[in-house]
Amino acid sequence: MGLYTLMVTFLCTIVLPVLLFLAAVKLWEMLMIRRVDPNCRSPLPPGTMGLPFIGETLQLILQRRKFLRMKRQKYGCIYKTHLFGNPTVRVMGADNVRQILLGEHKLVSVQWPASVRTILGSDTLSNVHGVQHKNKKKAIMRAFSRDALEHYIPVIQQEVKSAIQEWLQKDSCVLVYPEMKKLMFRIAMRILLGFEPEQIKTDEQELVEAFEEMIKNLFSLPIDVPFSGLYRGLRARNFIHSKIEENIRKKIQDDDNENEQKYKDALQLLIENSRRSDEPFSLQAMKEAATELLFGGHETTASTATSLVMFLGLNTEVVQKVREEVQEKVEMGMYTPGKGLSMELLDQLKYTGCVIKETLRINPPVPGGFRVALKTFELNGYQIPKGWNVIYSICDTHDVADVFPNKEEFQPERFMSKGLEDGSRFNYIPFGGGSRMCVGKEFAKVLLKIFLVELTQHCNWILSNGPPTMKTGPTIYPVDNLPTKFTSYVRN
């Protein structure tokens, strides 16, 4: 009797719950698969749907690149999963991505996860559609015109030089990633939002911490309860909005008083455009647009600038080639060391630009983009059902691109060939593509070129830990924060 009781207890406490759990998982997957379009003969992509309701969101959040690499190796360039509360198809490879990026408004439409839309705002450029997207994009593009970029250069150069001097004065190693986030945050606050340097010093620490909290919880389960990721993200967002609102009101007041400015920052241009528009931005829309600019203008550039320090620290011959290119422009009379840079000079630094392109190829700061299927369509023999999310992967597309020989190696020279760049339109997509291509890509290129010129002209550096392990969340970064020792460089 005792043995029988023990067996029953074992079955009830261990075996039965396991069987019920497995049955629930199977029923969940069957429920998801039943949502296919019966009018389409093509099968769903291979893959798994994970746990009921949660899907595979937790594995993605906890494992990121390891999880995505395992999925790609197992299922190939198109597979189904369940992420952030929605059935999802992940897509990679130039031909597949081309169909998604060029299918905007016909096959797919942009749709970021609910948590992203809630925190950043549903009316931001990345979340609106049609005419509204076209008008907002046109307004924001004014802030990234060639003339605007020319006016931004002195501010960028000043902030970069100041940061480099601080790094050189430190006896110990510099944690590059946190320092880079501070630097890019200051640049974005001044150029994109028009904060004064004194104001940045006062609010910087609180704003950086709030922004970190917001970014950390940007991709979370859409559950707004105390202490949830979404709750913490919204609380941080509200603090950022309060500081931005103060600045917006000050700008409107200065504009009414016709106070002269040295240059017009991106937010000022948005305010002016709104006043002339038939559909002016509300204060809330202004705050959301400014927050989006701040995210796009500093989080991604901080990631790429950190990767630049890493790759050049591991490939010192590239540093020397950048220096030689700059010296060539000095000898041609186009540049005097220590003086101001210009758009004309930056355009001429072809190899320096290739170093940035190669960095973006291996470590694109943003791993991919989100879309939703507007109707059921076929992609490479598989059915993509209407209403399912589609994630196109930038990093995986770069990884599987055959147009890049020796793709594991850091070789900026590969981009010196114009033919390669022309022939790799959808094999190389660090800024996305189609009508949703990053509006600030030219600003990012200018900023990163200035950073690279100043860094190589003033510094030598050694990575304390060698090649770091990289993690994504939501942009790519080194898990050890890239401790680096900087020393002064003196040209012979």
Swiss-Prot record:
<dbReference type="GO" id="GO:0030902">
    <property type="term" value="P:hindbrain development"/>
</dbReference>
<dbReference type="GO" id="GO:0048854">
    <property type="term" value="P:brain morphogenesis"/>
</dbReference>
<feature type="binding site" description="axial binding residue">
    <location>
        <position position="438"/>
    </location>
    <ligand>
        <name>heme</name>
    </ligand>
</feature>
<keyword id="KW-0256">Endoplasmic reticulum</keyword>
<keyword id="KW-0560">Oxidoreductase</keyword>
<dbReference type="GO" id="GO:0042573">
    <property type="term" value="P:retinoic acid metabolic process"/>
</dbReference>
<dbReference type="GO" id="GO:0005789">
    <property type="term" value="C:endoplasmic reticulum membrane"/>
</dbReference>
<dbReference type="GO" id="GO:0030917">
    <property type="term" value="P:midbrain-hindbrain boundary development"/>
</dbReference>
<dbReference type="GO" id="GO:0001944">
    <property type="term" value="P:vasculature development"/>
</dbReference>
<protein>
    <recommendedName>
        <fullName>Cytochrome P450 26A1</fullName>
        <ecNumber>1.14.13.-</ecNumber>
    </recommendedName>
</protein>
<dbReference type="InterPro" id="IPR002401">
    <property type="entry name" value="Cyt_P450_E_grp-I"/>
</dbReference>
<dbReference type="GO" id="GO:0008401">
    <property type="term" value="F:retinoic acid 4-hydroxylase activity"/>
</dbReference>
<keyword id="KW-0408">Iron</keyword>
<dbReference type="GO" id="GO:0034653">
    <property type="term" value="P:retinoic acid catabolic process"/>
</dbReference>
<dbReference type="GO" id="GO:0020037">
    <property type="term" value="F:heme binding"/>
</dbReference>
<keyword id="KW-0472">Membrane</keyword>
<dbReference type="GO" id="GO:0007417">
    <property type="term" value="P:central nervous system development"/>
</dbReference>
<dbReference type="InterPro" id="IPR036396">
    <property type="entry name" value="Cyt_P450_sf"/>
</dbReference>
<dbReference type="GO" id="GO:0021661">
    <property type="term" value="P:rhombomere 4 morphogenesis"/>
</dbReference>
<dbReference type="GO" id="GO:0007507">
    <property type="term" value="P:heart development"/>
</dbReference>
<dbReference type="GO" id="GO:0021797">
    <property type="term" value="P:forebrain anterior/posterior pattern specification"/>
</dbReference>
<comment type="similarity">
    <text>Belongs to the cytochrome P450 family.</text>
</comment>
<keyword id="KW-0492">Microsome</keyword>
<dbReference type="GO" id="GO:0003131">
    <property type="term" value="P:mesodermal-endodermal cell signaling"/>
</dbReference>
<dbReference type="InterPro" id="IPR001128">
    <property type="entry name" value="Cyt_P450"/>
</dbReference>
<dbReference type="GO" id="GO:0062182">
    <property type="term" value="F:all-trans retinoic acid 4-hydrolase activity"/>
</dbReference>
<dbReference type="GO" id="GO:0005506">
    <property type="term" value="F:iron ion binding"/>
</dbReference>
<dbReference type="GO" id="GO:0042574">
    <property type="term" value="P:retinal metabolic process"/>
</dbReference>
<dbReference type="GO" id="GO:0003151">
    <property type="term" value="P:outflow tract morphogenesis"/>
</dbReference>
<dbReference type="GO" id="GO:0055014">
    <property type="term" value="P:atrial cardiac muscle cell development"/>
</dbReference>
<dbReference type="GO" id="GO:0048384">
    <property type="term" value="P:retinoic acid receptor signaling pathway"/>
</dbReference>
<keyword id="KW-0443">Lipid metabolism</keyword>
<dbReference type="GO" id="GO:0031016">
    <property type="term" value="P:pancreas development"/>
</dbReference>
<dbReference type="Pfam" id="PF00067">
    <property type="entry name" value="p450"/>
</dbReference>
<dbReference type="GO" id="GO:0034672">
    <property type="term" value="P:anterior/posterior pattern specification involved in pronephros development"/>
</dbReference>
<dbReference type="GO" id="GO:0004497">
    <property type="term" value="F:monooxygenase activity"/>
</dbReference>
<dbReference type="GO" id="GO:0001756">
    <property type="term" value="P:somitogenesis"/>
</dbReference>
<dbReference type="GO" id="GO:0001568">
    <property type="term" value="P:blood vessel development"/>
</dbReference>
<keyword id="KW-0503">Monooxygenase</keyword>
<dbReference type="InterPro" id="IPR017972">
    <property type="entry name" value="Cyt_P450_CS"/>
</dbReference>
<comment type="function">
    <text>A cytochrome P450 monooxygenase involved in the metabolism of all-trans retinoic acid (atRA), a signaling molecule that binds to retinoic acid receptors and regulates gene transcription. Mechanistically, uses molecular oxygen inserting one oxygen atom into a substrate, and reducing the second into a water molecule, with two electrons provided by NADPH via cytochrome P450 reductase (CPR; NADPH-ferrihemoprotein reductase). Has no activity toward 9-cis and 13-cis retinoic acid stereoisomers.</text>
</comment>
<dbReference type="GO" id="GO:0071299">
    <property type="term" value="P:cellular response to vitamin A"/>
</dbReference>
